[in-house]
Amino acid sequence: MLVISANEQRNLVNMNEVIEYAALALKEFSAERTITPIRGSLPFANEQNTALIMPSVAEGLEALGVKIVTVVPQNKQIGKKTINGIVMLSDFQAGEPLALLEGSYLTMIRTGALSGVATKYLARHNAKTLCIIGTGEQAKGIAEAIFAVRDIEKVILYNRTEEKAYAFAQYIQEKFGKPAYVYKDPNEAVREADIIVTTTNATTPVFSEILQKGVHVNAVGSFRPSMQELPSHAIAKANKVVVESKEAALDETGDLQVPIKEGLFKANAIHAELGQIISGEKAGRENDEEITIFKSVGLAVVDIIVAKYLYERALEQGVGNKIEF
Protein backbone atom coordinates (compact mmCIF):
# COMPACT_ATOMS: atom_id res chain seq x y z
CA MET A 1 0.00 0.00 0.00
CA LEU A 2 1.26 3.47 -0.91
CA VAL A 3 1.02 6.27 1.67
CA ILE A 4 0.93 9.76 0.12
CA SER A 5 1.39 12.79 2.38
CA ALA A 6 -0.06 16.26 1.90
CA ASN A 7 3.31 17.67 0.84
CA GLU A 8 3.75 14.91 -1.73
CA GLN A 9 0.24 15.56 -3.10
CA ARG A 10 1.02 19.28 -3.36
CA ASN A 11 3.84 18.53 -5.78
CA LEU A 12 1.68 16.21 -7.89
CA VAL A 13 -1.30 18.49 -8.50
CA ASN A 14 -2.12 20.21 -11.77
CA MET A 15 -5.35 22.11 -11.06
CA ASN A 16 -6.55 22.04 -14.68
CA GLU A 17 -6.26 18.25 -14.66
CA VAL A 18 -8.02 17.98 -11.27
CA ILE A 19 -10.90 20.09 -12.63
CA GLU A 20 -11.23 17.68 -15.58
CA TYR A 21 -11.28 14.65 -13.27
CA ALA A 22 -13.84 16.30 -10.98
CA ALA A 23 -16.06 16.99 -14.00
CA LEU A 24 -15.74 13.37 -15.11
CA ALA A 25 -16.75 12.14 -11.64
CA LEU A 26 -19.77 14.48 -11.53
CA LYS A 27 -20.89 13.31 -14.97
CA GLU A 28 -20.64 9.65 -13.95
CA PHE A 29 -22.59 10.37 -10.76
CA SER A 30 -25.47 12.16 -12.50
CA ALA A 31 -25.63 9.39 -15.12
CA GLU A 32 -26.18 6.97 -12.20
CA ARG A 33 -23.03 5.01 -12.98
CA THR A 34 -21.65 5.22 -9.44
CA ILE A 35 -22.69 3.96 -6.02
CA THR A 36 -22.34 7.02 -3.80
CA PRO A 37 -24.48 6.91 -0.65
CA ILE A 38 -25.34 10.09 1.25
CA ARG A 39 -22.38 10.60 3.54
CA GLY A 40 -22.59 9.60 7.16
CA SER A 41 -22.40 12.60 9.47
CA LEU A 42 -21.48 11.93 13.10
CA PRO A 43 -21.51 14.92 15.48
CA PHE A 44 -19.17 14.55 18.47
CA ALA A 45 -17.83 16.56 21.44
CA ASN A 46 -21.27 17.93 22.34
CA GLU A 47 -22.06 18.36 18.62
CA GLN A 48 -19.40 21.04 18.21
CA ASN A 49 -17.46 18.80 15.81
CA THR A 50 -18.39 16.51 12.94
CA ALA A 51 -17.00 13.27 11.52
CA LEU A 52 -17.93 12.61 7.89
CA ILE A 53 -17.75 9.15 6.30
CA MET A 54 -17.91 9.12 2.50
CA PRO A 55 -17.65 5.86 0.49
CA SER A 56 -18.02 5.51 -3.27
CA VAL A 57 -17.67 3.06 -6.16
CA ALA A 58 -17.34 4.27 -9.75
CA GLU A 59 -17.68 1.16 -11.91
CA GLY A 60 -16.86 2.75 -15.27
CA LEU A 61 -13.80 4.52 -13.85
CA GLU A 62 -12.67 1.43 -11.89
CA ALA A 63 -12.40 3.34 -8.63
CA LEU A 64 -13.29 2.23 -5.09
CA GLY A 65 -12.56 4.08 -1.88
CA VAL A 66 -13.68 5.88 1.24
CA LYS A 67 -12.88 9.24 2.79
CA ILE A 68 -13.12 9.92 6.51
CA VAL A 69 -12.87 13.55 7.60
CA THR A 70 -13.26 15.38 10.90
CA VAL A 71 -14.28 19.04 11.08
CA VAL A 72 -13.29 20.76 14.33
CA PRO A 73 -13.95 24.54 14.06
CA GLN A 74 -12.31 25.33 17.42
CA ASN A 75 -8.95 23.98 16.22
CA LYS A 76 -8.14 27.30 14.56
CA GLN A 77 -7.98 28.92 18.01
CA ILE A 78 -5.08 26.64 18.97
CA GLY A 79 -3.29 26.81 15.64
CA LYS A 80 -4.39 23.41 14.36
CA LYS A 81 -6.15 22.45 11.12
CA THR A 82 -9.95 22.52 11.31
CA ILE A 83 -10.22 19.70 8.74
CA ASN A 84 -8.31 16.43 9.15
CA GLY A 85 -8.83 13.20 7.29
CA ILE A 86 -7.69 10.27 5.20
CA VAL A 87 -8.73 8.72 1.91
CA MET A 88 -8.27 5.00 1.34
CA LEU A 89 -8.30 3.52 -2.16
CA SER A 90 -8.77 -0.20 -2.78
CA ASP A 91 -7.69 -2.18 -5.82
CA PHE A 92 -10.78 -2.41 -8.03
CA GLN A 93 -10.20 -6.03 -9.07
CA ALA A 94 -8.61 -7.65 -6.00
CA GLY A 95 -10.11 -5.42 -3.30
CA GLU A 96 -6.72 -5.05 -1.60
CA PRO A 97 -5.72 -1.75 0.07
CA LEU A 98 -4.03 0.30 -2.63
CA ALA A 99 -3.26 3.71 -1.17
CA LEU A 100 -3.76 5.91 1.87
CA LEU A 101 -3.78 9.65 1.22
CA GLU A 102 -3.75 12.53 3.70
CA GLY A 103 -7.28 13.90 3.41
CA SER A 104 -7.32 17.59 4.30
CA TYR A 105 -5.14 18.71 1.37
CA LEU A 106 -7.07 16.43 -1.00
CA THR A 107 -10.33 17.94 0.33
CA MET A 108 -9.04 21.45 -0.33
CA ILE A 109 -8.05 20.54 -3.90
CA ARG A 110 -11.29 18.74 -4.75
CA THR A 111 -13.39 21.51 -3.14
CA GLY A 112 -11.56 23.97 -5.33
CA ALA A 113 -12.00 21.80 -8.42
CA LEU A 114 -15.77 21.54 -7.85
CA SER A 115 -16.05 25.33 -7.74
CA GLY A 116 -13.81 25.46 -10.81
CA VAL A 117 -16.18 23.20 -12.74
CA ALA A 118 -19.23 25.17 -11.58
CA THR A 119 -17.60 28.49 -12.46
CA LYS A 120 -16.65 27.19 -15.91
CA TYR A 121 -20.28 26.36 -16.74
CA LEU A 122 -22.18 28.98 -14.74
CA ALA A 123 -20.16 32.20 -14.43
CA ARG A 124 -20.14 34.86 -17.13
CA HIS A 125 -17.24 34.44 -19.55
CA ASN A 126 -16.23 38.06 -18.94
CA ALA A 127 -16.26 37.77 -15.12
CA LYS A 128 -13.29 39.76 -13.76
CA THR A 129 -13.93 40.34 -10.03
CA LEU A 130 -13.89 37.52 -7.49
CA CYS A 131 -15.18 37.96 -3.93
CA ILE A 132 -14.27 35.36 -1.30
CA ILE A 133 -16.03 35.38 2.06
CA GLY A 134 -14.11 33.16 4.46
CA THR A 135 -10.35 32.95 3.98
CA GLY A 136 -9.48 29.61 5.57
CA GLU A 137 -7.61 26.72 3.94
CA GLN A 138 -10.49 25.73 1.63
CA ALA A 139 -10.40 29.17 0.00
CA LYS A 140 -6.91 28.47 -1.40
CA GLY A 141 -8.04 25.61 -3.63
CA ILE A 142 -11.16 27.50 -4.72
CA ALA A 143 -9.20 30.60 -5.72
CA GLU A 144 -6.69 28.53 -7.70
CA ALA A 145 -9.46 26.68 -9.55
CA ILE A 146 -11.40 29.85 -10.41
CA PHE A 147 -8.21 31.48 -11.70
CA ALA A 148 -7.80 28.40 -13.94
CA VAL A 149 -11.18 28.90 -15.66
CA ARG A 150 -11.70 32.70 -15.64
CA ASP A 151 -9.41 35.67 -16.23
CA ILE A 152 -9.80 37.28 -12.81
CA GLU A 153 -8.32 40.78 -12.48
CA LYS A 154 -9.38 41.72 -8.93
CA VAL A 155 -9.94 39.72 -5.74
CA ILE A 156 -12.05 41.03 -2.85
CA LEU A 157 -11.75 39.34 0.54
CA TYR A 158 -13.83 39.39 3.71
CA ASN A 159 -13.18 37.42 6.87
CA ARG A 160 -14.51 37.90 10.40
CA THR A 161 -10.91 37.85 11.66
CA GLU A 162 -9.45 40.64 9.55
CA GLU A 163 -5.77 39.72 9.94
CA LYS A 164 -6.48 36.34 8.33
CA ALA A 165 -7.98 38.13 5.34
CA TYR A 166 -4.83 40.26 5.02
CA ALA A 167 -2.65 37.14 5.22
CA PHE A 168 -4.76 35.56 2.47
CA ALA A 169 -4.48 38.71 0.34
CA GLN A 170 -0.70 38.42 0.59
CA TYR A 171 -0.91 34.74 -0.42
CA ILE A 172 -3.01 35.62 -3.51
CA GLN A 173 -0.66 38.41 -4.53
CA GLU A 174 2.51 36.36 -4.07
CA LYS A 175 1.33 33.04 -5.54
CA PHE A 176 -0.88 34.27 -8.39
CA GLY A 177 0.15 37.90 -8.95
CA LYS A 178 -3.46 39.09 -8.58
CA PRO A 179 -4.37 42.31 -6.74
CA ALA A 180 -6.34 41.43 -3.58
CA TYR A 181 -8.22 43.81 -1.29
CA VAL A 182 -9.66 43.28 2.18
CA TYR A 183 -13.13 44.76 2.80
CA LYS A 184 -14.63 45.44 6.22
CA ASP A 185 -18.25 45.04 5.03
CA PRO A 186 -19.32 41.76 3.37
CA ASN A 187 -22.28 43.48 1.68
CA GLU A 188 -19.98 45.97 0.00
CA ALA A 189 -17.74 43.10 -1.10
CA VAL A 190 -20.66 41.16 -2.60
CA ARG A 191 -21.99 44.26 -4.38
CA GLU A 192 -18.85 44.61 -6.52
CA ALA A 193 -18.36 40.95 -7.46
CA ASP A 194 -18.93 38.98 -10.67
CA ILE A 195 -18.22 35.72 -8.83
CA ILE A 196 -18.88 35.20 -5.10
CA VAL A 197 -17.47 32.37 -3.00
CA THR A 198 -18.67 31.63 0.54
CA THR A 199 -16.54 29.18 2.49
CA THR A 200 -17.34 29.56 6.19
CA ASN A 201 -18.78 27.61 9.11
CA ALA A 202 -21.58 30.16 9.51
CA THR A 203 -24.94 29.24 11.02
CA THR A 204 -26.51 32.53 9.87
CA PRO A 205 -26.11 34.24 6.47
CA VAL A 206 -22.76 35.92 5.88
CA PHE A 207 -24.27 38.78 3.86
CA SER A 208 -27.72 40.33 3.37
CA GLU A 209 -27.21 42.22 0.10
CA ILE A 210 -29.55 41.51 -2.83
CA LEU A 211 -27.51 39.74 -5.52
CA GLN A 212 -26.67 41.74 -8.65
CA LYS A 213 -27.82 40.52 -12.06
CA GLY A 214 -25.28 38.31 -13.80
CA VAL A 215 -23.48 37.20 -10.64
CA HIS A 216 -22.44 33.60 -9.98
CA VAL A 217 -22.15 32.20 -6.43
CA ASN A 218 -20.20 29.15 -5.25
CA ALA A 219 -21.51 28.38 -1.74
CA VAL A 220 -19.35 25.65 -0.22
CA GLY A 221 -19.36 26.06 3.56
CA SER A 222 -22.75 24.83 4.80
CA PHE A 223 -22.80 21.04 5.19
CA ARG A 224 -25.32 20.68 8.04
CA PRO A 225 -29.01 21.62 8.29
CA SER A 226 -28.03 24.05 11.08
CA MET A 227 -25.56 25.90 8.83
CA GLN A 228 -26.59 28.68 6.44
CA GLU A 229 -24.23 30.98 4.53
CA LEU A 230 -26.59 32.48 1.97
CA PRO A 231 -29.62 34.64 2.80
CA SER A 232 -32.82 32.83 1.86
CA HIS A 233 -33.71 35.55 -0.66
CA ALA A 234 -30.54 34.72 -2.65
CA ILE A 235 -31.69 31.14 -3.21
CA ALA A 236 -35.27 32.27 -3.86
CA LYS A 237 -34.33 34.87 -6.49
CA ALA A 238 -31.62 32.93 -8.32
CA ASN A 239 -32.42 31.95 -11.90
CA LYS A 240 -30.55 28.67 -11.55
CA VAL A 241 -29.66 26.75 -8.37
CA VAL A 242 -27.27 23.88 -9.14
CA VAL A 243 -25.95 21.12 -6.84
CA GLU A 244 -23.69 18.05 -7.09
CA SER A 245 -26.43 15.71 -5.84
CA LYS A 246 -30.04 16.77 -5.33
CA GLU A 247 -30.58 14.12 -2.68
CA ALA A 248 -27.47 15.04 -0.70
CA ALA A 249 -27.98 18.80 -0.94
CA LEU A 250 -31.59 18.62 0.23
CA ASP A 251 -30.61 16.29 3.07
CA GLU A 252 -27.53 18.12 4.30
CA THR A 253 -27.54 21.89 3.93
CA GLY A 254 -29.39 24.69 5.66
CA ASP A 255 -28.75 26.85 2.59
CA LEU A 256 -31.59 24.92 0.93
CA GLN A 257 -33.53 23.60 3.92
CA VAL A 258 -34.11 27.03 5.50
CA PRO A 259 -35.62 28.76 2.43
CA ILE A 260 -37.72 25.65 1.77
CA LYS A 261 -39.08 25.76 5.35
CA GLU A 262 -39.74 29.49 4.95
CA GLY A 263 -41.79 28.79 1.83
CA LEU A 264 -39.41 30.79 -0.38
CA PHE A 265 -38.04 27.86 -2.41
CA LYS A 266 -39.19 24.41 -3.48
CA ALA A 267 -37.05 21.29 -3.76
CA ASN A 268 -38.19 20.76 -7.34
CA ALA A 269 -36.95 24.25 -8.22
CA ILE A 270 -33.33 23.02 -8.22
CA HIS A 271 -32.31 23.54 -11.84
CA ALA A 272 -29.88 20.65 -12.21
CA GLU A 273 -27.06 18.58 -10.88
CA LEU A 274 -23.73 19.88 -12.14
CA GLY A 275 -23.06 16.56 -13.89
CA GLN A 276 -26.22 17.05 -15.98
CA ILE A 277 -24.90 20.40 -17.19
CA ILE A 278 -21.48 18.92 -18.00
CA SER A 279 -23.12 16.18 -20.10
CA GLY A 280 -25.34 18.67 -21.94
CA GLU A 281 -28.55 17.21 -20.52
CA LYS A 282 -29.33 20.54 -18.82
CA ALA A 283 -28.31 24.09 -19.71
CA GLY A 284 -25.63 26.06 -17.89
CA ARG A 285 -25.59 29.87 -18.02
CA GLU A 286 -27.74 31.06 -20.92
CA ASN A 287 -27.26 34.85 -20.74
CA ASP A 288 -25.33 37.57 -18.92
CA GLU A 289 -28.29 38.58 -16.75
CA GLU A 290 -28.89 35.29 -14.95
CA ILE A 291 -28.10 34.87 -11.26
CA THR A 292 -26.62 31.40 -10.79
CA ILE A 293 -25.81 29.58 -7.55
CA PHE A 294 -23.79 26.40 -7.09
CA LYS A 295 -24.52 24.96 -3.66
CA SER A 296 -21.80 22.42 -2.90
CA VAL A 297 -21.85 19.87 -0.09
CA GLY A 298 -19.11 17.64 -1.49
CA LEU A 299 -19.48 14.26 -3.15
CA ALA A 300 -17.50 11.14 -2.27
CA VAL A 301 -17.04 9.99 -5.85
CA VAL A 302 -15.14 13.20 -6.62
CA ASP A 303 -12.80 12.57 -3.68
CA ILE A 304 -12.18 9.02 -4.85
CA ILE A 305 -11.51 9.99 -8.48
CA VAL A 306 -9.17 12.81 -7.43
CA ALA A 307 -7.42 10.38 -5.04
CA LYS A 308 -7.00 7.90 -7.90
CA TYR A 309 -5.53 10.67 -10.07
CA LEU A 310 -3.03 11.53 -7.31
CA TYR A 311 -2.18 7.84 -6.79
CA GLU A 312 -1.46 7.35 -10.49
CA ARG A 313 0.67 10.52 -10.58
CA ALA A 314 2.57 9.29 -7.50
CA LEU A 315 3.33 5.96 -9.21
CA GLU A 316 4.55 7.77 -12.34
CA GLN A 317 6.88 10.00 -10.34
CA GLY A 318 8.02 7.47 -7.73
CA VAL A 319 6.47 9.47 -4.89
CA GLY A 320 5.02 8.11 -1.63
CA ASN A 321 5.97 5.62 1.06
CA LYS A 322 5.22 1.96 0.31
CA ILE A 323 4.27 -0.09 3.38
CA GLU A 324 3.40 -3.75 3.88
CA PHE A 325 0.41 -4.75 6.01
UniProtKB/Swiss-Prot annotation:
EC number, UniProt record: 1.5.1.49
Key words of the record: NAD, NADP, Oxidoreductase
Class of the enzyme per the UniProt entry, highest EC level: oxidoreductase
Signal peptide extent: none
Keyword rRNA-binding attributed: no
GO CC field: cytoplasm
InterPro entries: NAD(P)-bd_dom_sf, ODC_Mu_crystall, ODC_N
Pfam families the UniProt entry points to: OCD_Mu_crystall
Superkingdom in the source lineage: Bacteria
Recorded catalytic activity of this chain's protein: L-proline + NAD(+) = 1-pyrroline-2-carboxylate + NADH + H(+); L-proline + NADP(+) = 1-pyrroline-2-carboxylate + NADPH + H(+)
Keyword presence, Oxidoreductase: yes
GO terms for MF: oxidoreductase activity
Family statement: Belongs to the ornithine cyclodeaminase/mu-crystallin family.
General function of this protein: Catalyzes the reduction of Delta(1)-pyrroline-2-carboxylate (Pyr2C) to L-proline, using preferentially NADPH over NADH as the electron donor. Is likely involved in a degradation pathway that converts trans-3-hydroxy-L-proline (t3LHyp) to L-proline, which allows B.cereus to grow on t3LHyp as a sole carbon source.
Protein name according to UniProt: Delta(1)-pyrroline-2-carboxylate reductase
Source organism (scientific name): Bacillus cereus (strain ATCC 14579 / DSM 31 / CCUG 7414 / JCM 2152 / NBRC 15305 / NCIMB 9373 / NCTC 2599 / NRRL B-3711)
